[in-house]
Structures are given as structure tokens and as C-alpha cells.
Amino acid sequence: MLLLIGAGIGWFIESETPYAATWFAENGPVEWPQAVVVGLAAVVFAVCAWRSPGPLGTWCIPIAYLLACAIVREMPACESHFYDGGACIERSWKTVLVTTGGAIMLVGFFLRRHNLMAMIKPRWSFVFWPLGIAFLLLIVAEVGEKFGHEGIEEMLEFSAYIHAFCFSVWVFGQTRRPQPTGRSERSHVPFGRPIV
């Protein structure tokens, strides 16, 4: 449904309105809402990782990192020939940010190393299947770009980021704040089944 809605809106703006060239231009207006939404999703997943010290929270670490990388990707490079002003990040700093984020992710994995084997069990990994929908939307968006449909590409990307943000809010509701030492933290998975 998201695929059809996003593609339909993108196609309509692209083919039926005079604003497509401006709206979908490199560093155009659509880039900023995308960056904001994916940034919010990354923050929520990072908070979920802090709130849940178990496998659920451990899964949120790489997800937050990948979403943060998406923010860097959405921000224009200052050296780009398409850059025409506004906020930007130099390519060298993009590399620094991605590398630093990767290092933080590895530290998080090290601190949660006791969860690494548990997190790959279907009981935990299947919780995050909705992100596969966002990934599918991004793949179709890339196909749209290759065929010259920038409107479809950008709106599918936007749909993917909105979907990821909504899912991050759901995950937030399945986690609880860290409990004092000596008390086990309980979180929830679909259908209200509690798991430790």
C-alpha cells in the first residue's frame, strides 16, 4: 500500500504539476523533510537501545546507525556540482561521521556482547520485519531513479522514512527504562507476550 501511495503521489507531482523540477531537485525542498523524519527515527531507535538492555535494544543499535547514515546521505555534499546553497556537509566530514558512528556501534555491540547470540534468534529478529518494507521501498526508489522518475524516487524514499519512524515509535512502546541493579528488565513483543 505504501509502495502504491508513494509512487502515485510522486508520479502525480512529477507529471501533472509544474513544481517537480524545483521540489525534486538535488538539495530541493523534499530533501529536508526526509532528513528530519529519518533523523527522528534514528533518535527514537537510539533511545530504545538505551531503554532496553536486552536483545531488543541491541537490535536497535545497528538500526539507529543505518538511519544516521541515511541522514548523512540525504545531506548534500558542499563540493557537489548540484549544490546551490544552504546547509551541506563536506565529503571528508561525511566519511568521518559514518566512521565515527560505526565505531560507536561496535562499542555498543561490545557492551552488549552477551546479547549477540540471542538477538539472531527468530524470537527477536522477527520483531523487526516491518523494516523490510522500508528497505523494499528504497530499492524500488532506486529503480525509479534509474528510469528518470525522480518524483517517484523521492516520494518512495519519504514513504520509507515515515514507515521507519512510525515503526520506531512502536518499538519505543515495547521497551521500558533500565531497571535498578538486581531487577530484570522486561519488554514486550507482538501480541502482548512478555519476554525478559
Model-derived features with residue positions:
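Juxtamembrane "helix-exit" motif on the non-cytosolic side of transmembrane helices
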Residues: 12-22, 75-84, 113-115, 140-148
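Membrane-proximal helix-loop-helix units in multi-pass membrane proteins
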Residues: 64, 68-121
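Alpha-helical transmembrane segments of polytopic membrane proteins
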Residues: 26-39, 90-102, 153-162
